[in-house]
Amino acid sequence: MLWQTFFSSLLLLSLLFGCNGDESLPEVTDSEEAPMDKREREALYSAIQGFVGDSWNGSALYPDPCGWTPIQGVSCDIYNDLWYVTDLSLGLIYENSLPCSSSLQIRPELFELKHLRSLSFFNCFISPMVIAKEELWTNFASNLESLEFRSNPGLIGELPETIGNLTKLKSLVVLENGFSGELPASICNLKRLKRLVFAGNSFAGMIPNCFKGLKELLILDLSRNSFSGTLPTSFGDLVSLLKLDLSNNLLEGNLPQELGFLKNLTLLDLRNNRFSGGLSKNIENIQSLTELVLSNNPMGEEDMVGTNWGKMSNLVVLDLSKMGLRGEIPTSLTNLKRLRFLGLNNNNLTGFVPSKKLEALPCLGALYINGNNLTGELRFSTKFYEKMGRRFKASKNPNLCQPLEMVMSESHKHLSPLGVKPCT
């Protein structure tokens, strides 16, 4: 009993004074010890209420938004022993996110969140409205690193020139909204950008030729707009770029030689534009490419043999359909051992199909050569047809045929390519 009392006393002393004789235990930091800045909390409530509706009572529902009553879409961090909002996402991004009201307001209190690093709006702006006053956005210039507007058809008008004042931005995503007009050249002031997306809007006019300083940019997506004119030569200075998507615009002219300087590029998608003048010889120098999509551009009577496709050994997707290409299918294509998709359809290709060499490509899972002037006999094996299924098309080649036994065989005729006549 005496020993039990002795050890209990030792335990009590260790709790009171610590192992090293300290007179107090370490402090625990929580929302009680680090309260939220009062003005910050009120600004947050008012800003969210403007988007959600006046019936939303933030102080009653979420009395401690950075602590024990967190708001979905709100993240906080501590500055000078006080909690401040650092991330704010509005709209039904997640199942339990706060939905935006059809009569929302962008209140000035939003721009009082001075430590905000990330701000995103998803499916919030449905009714037509112009983005908030230009001068308010400069309040975010010191800290904002990510700004996203996704699926907001009611966001109309031009992108404000003051967007270029947000020089800390690393990610600017303006995806599937109602913006129109020309891109402000001030976006090229955003030297820290790694991702720049303006896809799915109604932007028009020429792309500003001012990208020289964006050395850190990894992703540039301007697809699904109405941009016109030629490609800026300053694209060649985007030395870190991994993905360039300019598809579905009204761009025209020759492909600039400067594209060949993009040595880290993995995706180049220029489909559905008006480019002409043939394939740029420098494209074959982008040996990092895994996806090259140039389909539906009137490139003219370009001979495919003039390009050494074998140099682009990392290609997985190659789509050159509807380009007016002529000549034979180059044998250098058969060196692309990683190729899974090859689209050569609806061109003016002639000559024989290198069946055995194409079949030898180990990863090939889709081959489209329909709509050309190819001749001779298809010499693919039944195993190839079984593998490809309907992902192989060779129809609309008037002088192309398939072996008679392929058509006559009851066990194989279901594999024979549609629209290819039997050889006689």
Swiss-Prot record:
Q: Which domain of life is it from?
A: Eukaryota
Membrane-spanning regions, if any? none
Q: Where in the cell is it found?
A: Cell membrane
**Membrane protein topology class:** Peripheral membrane protein
Ranges: LRR repeats: 141-166, 167-190, 191-213, 214-237, 238-263, 265-286, 287-311, 312-336, 337-360, 362-387
- A Pfam family annotated for this chain is LRR_1
Keyword terms of this UniProt record:
Cell membrane, Leucine-rich repeat, Membrane, Repeat, Signal
Provide the primary localization: membrane
**Any GO BP annotation:** response to symbiotic fungus
Residue span of the signal peptide, if any? 1-21
GO cellular component terms given for this protein: plasma membrane
| Entry function | Required for growth promotion and enhanced seed production mediated by the endophytic fungus Piriformospora indica.
State the remark under miscellaneous.
Loss-of-function mutants do not show any induction of At5g16590, another leucine-rich repeat protein located in plasma membrane microdomains.
Output this protein's name. Piriformospora indica-insensitive protein 2
Q: Which gene encodes it?
A: PII-2
